[in-house]
């Protein structure tokens, strides 16, 4: 994006350096040249989309292990011990693929669009509107 901005500023600077300062009126040739320059620069000024999406549809998963008072062997952490209560606690962060079944996606879509599937004891407000 910075390179595009620099290119546009360089183009504008070069056009300003060679602009005829003595003539006050623009003729047809100058208008066509200006339109051509604008047509070249216009695609460079388009905003680019965000590219933060993970290609494999993975998301960070945070797992907290608290084994204080538990007699089981702690196998999640393999680093050096601190010889206090932190030896029985561990936080694990991993990137895992997130999958959703097509049936669940269809149910959610129906819920968002038409209010068909809702939770238990939740009134459906889409059918409560008065029809005049």
UniProtKB/Swiss-Prot annotation:
Gene3D superfamilies: Phycoerythrin alpha chain (3.90.510.10). GO terms for cellular component: chloroplast thylakoid membrane; phycobilisome. (2R,3E)-phycocyanobilin 2 binds at residue 68. The keyword Transport applies. Its main location: plastid. The keyword Acetylation does not apply. GO terms for biological process: photosynthesis. Mesobiliverdin binds at residues 70, 76-77, 92. Contains two phycocyanobilin chromophores, one mesobiliverdin chromophore and one 15,16-dihydrobiliverdin chromophore with binding mediated by both the alpha and beta subunits. (2R,3E)-phycocyanobilin 1 binds at residue 54. Keywords: Bile pigment, Chloroplast, Chromophore, Electron transport, Membrane, Photosynthesis, Plastid, Thylakoid, Transport. 15,16-dihydrobiliverdin binds at residues 123, 125. It is a peripheral membrane protein. It comes from the Eukaryota. Light-harvesting photosynthetic tetrapyrrole chromophore-protein from the phycobiliprotein complex. The light-harvesting system in Cryptophytes contains phycobiliprotein complexes. Unusually they are composed of either phycoerythrin (CPE) or phycocyanin (CPC) but never allophycocyanin (APC), with only one type of biliprotein being present in any one species. Unlike cyanobacteria or red algae these proteins are not arranged into higher-order phycobilisome complexes, and they are found in the thylakoid lumen. Belongs to the phycoerythrin family. This is Phycocyanin PC645 alpha-1 subunit. It comes from Chroomonas sp. (strain CCMP270).
